[in-house]
């Protein structure tokens, strides 16, 4: 039997059998050694090999998937209510003629990604645990508000005032703690802010642990991002730091709905494969969630590899068109590429083909990915979840190029959403696009409450106050305040003396953190290298060339000073994470970052 892309299937099978034999009798270490030797030999012989990509399939096999807990029928019902209320919030905001904007399609594509997190993974801060830290994708804010509405944390008045904040009862467009200080923990808009800030949050959490200022609790930093957002330089500019420092407390979930604001993210390529190679090269563990469980029987029957070949060959622009055109089109243009692939679906109706779901809409596949991500040791994890932009919002909206800009829906589209998600509205009620919240004693609300109680409390939530630091007397700065007495002094020299004075104060010296973007010598801070030590997540494994000097370059795992390299955005992100440590850790810190403003 010929495999697609294989000119000698028998020889291939012999190699695979030999590898399986080594694996069985000599173990994974020997198998990995042999593969590495073959790879090195191939490179030496100039054989072109793409090593950073895995097949366009789910990383976690069906056999490896854990059993999913909870009542999935109930969770599906709750997810439908959240979807509806998120949709209603945006539509009502644009129904009055004010055209306030908002986003329908982003949350529609990622509802399952959030739902599985809220029901099974996101742990809240409480008396016994510091809590996970979650960066929510900005355009998905309506969905988070909709969940809080069902939980009773927000009222219908709040939802009716989405993007109307003047009177104090409104909801901001995007996550921001300044606007909702009890609710949003982190700002994530403009796009690119969430990615870099989440990396440096994880970095600072490890820094504080390594200095013994907070305890190790296996807290996770989750960041929800978009595939289009990955084009922001801030999104991927710091991923090497996460890999280099082995930030296994960091989990990114990239919603790969294949579309950005105007059109496809990579119409002529495959964004999931591109991101996989990028993150694997930076030392991340990559978990791909490409196909939902309805594909599993077809893949199991794909003995020739024809279906897998079609999956590999199809570009993202074509996947988008397949979603728009439906089952009959997919039968001809996708499965019809190879007779063996077409044979796999001969007993499926066009509707059955339509129901072949993407991985990011399958709670079982998403749960498996999250569970695996939470076991990470020594690597950050990125989950690349394939979804449909505007999922469930009718054929007029799903996957079309203009979906991101749609703020209003026709009555027929609303009927489609109602019927698809089994919502309790008649045609007349649909005209008003009403919010819906079951009674307090309903099974849905009881289930939501129980799940959040099991995970420590409701989210999002933000601590506004923390322990107080002892403020030093002004006399601490006497040497500076009395002036230079006729001697010339630079402002940077004075600043260094102020920092040095604070670092001598017993009550706060551990909380003062000098941060430099590779400009310590410029500012005259090199004396702190040896005195404080430069933080290095993995310690110092070399002897610096200036070891014999008093102010030598000393790195240490418990180093006090942050040297972020030529990286002002990273230094500012580290400063923000430390400055808000009072909220995230109940640990006030005093970060001191001298920003070289002439280049800012």
Language model: regions and residue ranges:
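N-terminal amphipathic, basic-rich helices that act as targeting or association modules
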Residues: 2-151, 417, 488-505, 509, ...
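Hydrophobic alpha-helical scaffolding
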Residues: 5-9, 24-28, 68, 72-76, ...
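Long, well-ordered, tryptophan-enriched scaffold segments
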Residues: 6, 256-486
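Beta-sheet entry/capping signal
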Residues: 21, 102-105, 131-134, 220-222, ...
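Non-catalytic terminal/interface segments that mediate subunit docking, oligomerization
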Residues: 64-86, 107, 122-125, 132-133, ...
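Cofactor-binding active-site loop characterized by glycine-rich and histidine/acidic residues
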Residues: 66-82, 86-98, 103-245, 268-269, ...
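Acidic, glycine-rich active-site loops and adjacent beta-strand->loop/helix elements
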Residues: 138-142, 165-166, 222-232, 255-260, ...
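Boundary/activation segment at the start of structured domains
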Residues: 243-251, 257, 281
């Amino acid at each position: 039997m010929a495999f697609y892309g294989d000119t000698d299937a028998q020889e291939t099978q012999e190699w695979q059998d030999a590898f399986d034999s080594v694996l069985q009798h000599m173990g994974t270490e020997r198998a990995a050694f042999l593969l590495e030797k073959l790879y090195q030999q191939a490179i030496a012989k100039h054989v072109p090999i793409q090593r950073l990509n895995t097949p366009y399939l789910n990383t976690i096999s069906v056999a490896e998937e854990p059993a999913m807990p909870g009542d999935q029928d109930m969770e599906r019902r709750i997810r439908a209510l959240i979807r509806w209320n998120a949709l209603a919030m945006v539509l009502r905001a644009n129904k009055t003629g004010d055209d306030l904007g908002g986003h329908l399609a982003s949350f529609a594509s990622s509802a399952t990604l959030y739902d599985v997190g809220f029901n099974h993974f996101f742990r809240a801060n409480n008396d016994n645990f510091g809590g996970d830290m979650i960066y929510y994708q900005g355009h998905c804010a309506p969905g988070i508000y909709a969940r809080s509405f069902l939980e009773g944390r927000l009222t219908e008045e709040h939802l009716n005032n989405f993007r109307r904040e003047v009177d104090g009862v409104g909801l901001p467009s995007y996550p921001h703690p300044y606007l909702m200080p009890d609710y949003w923990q982190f700002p994530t808009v403009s796009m690119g802010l969430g990615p870099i800030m989440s990396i440096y949050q994880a970095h600072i959490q490890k820094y504080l642990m390594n200095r013994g200022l907070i305890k190790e609790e296996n807290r996770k930093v989750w960041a929800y991002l978009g595939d289009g957002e990955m084009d922001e330089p801030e999104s991927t500019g710091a991923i090497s730091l996460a890999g280099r420092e082995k930030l296994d407390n960091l989990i990114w979930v990239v919603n790969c709905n294949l579309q950005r604001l105007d059109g496809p993210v990579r119409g002529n390529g495959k964004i999931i494969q591109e991101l996989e190679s990028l993150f694997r090269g930076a030392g991340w563990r990559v978990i791909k969630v490409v196909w939902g469980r309805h594909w599993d029987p077809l893949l199991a029957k794909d003995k020739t590899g024809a279906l897998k070949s079609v999956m590999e060959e199809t570009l993202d622009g074509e996947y988008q068109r397949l979603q728009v055109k439906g089952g009959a089109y997919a039968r001809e243009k996708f499965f019809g590429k190879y007779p063996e692939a077409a044979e796999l679906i001969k007993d499926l109706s066009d509707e059955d083909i339509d129901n072949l779901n993407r991985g990011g809409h399958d709670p079982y596949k998403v749960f498996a990915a999250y569970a695996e991500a939470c076991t990470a040791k020594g690597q950050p994890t990125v989950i690349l979840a394939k979804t449909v932009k505007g999922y469930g919002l009718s054929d007029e909206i799903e996957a079309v190029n203009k979906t991101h800009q749609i703020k209003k829906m026709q009555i027929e589209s609303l009927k489609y959403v109602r019927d698809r998600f089994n919502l309790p509205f008649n045609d007349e009620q649909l005209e008003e696009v009403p919010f819906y919240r079951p009674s307090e004693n309903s099974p849905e609300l009881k289930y939501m409450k129980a799940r959040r109680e099991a995970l420590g409390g409701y989210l999002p939530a933000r601590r506004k106050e923390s322990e107080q630091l002892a403020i030093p007397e002004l006399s601490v700065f006497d040497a500076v305040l009395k002036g230079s007495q006729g001697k010339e002094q630079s402002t940077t020299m004075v600043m260094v003396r102020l920092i040095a004075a604070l670092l001598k104060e017993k009550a706060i010296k551990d909380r003062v953190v000098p941060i430099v973007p590779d400009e310590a010598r410029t500012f005259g801070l090199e004396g702190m290298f040896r005195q404080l030590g430069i933080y290095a997540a993995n310690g110092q494994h070399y002897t610096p060339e200036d070891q014999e000097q008093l102010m030598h370059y000393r790195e240490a795992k418990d180093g006090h000073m942050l040297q972020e390299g030529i990286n002002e955005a990273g230094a500012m992100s580290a400063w923000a994470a430390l400055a808000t440590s009072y909220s995230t850790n109940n640990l006030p810190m005093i970060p001191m970052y001298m920003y070289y403003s002439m280049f800012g």
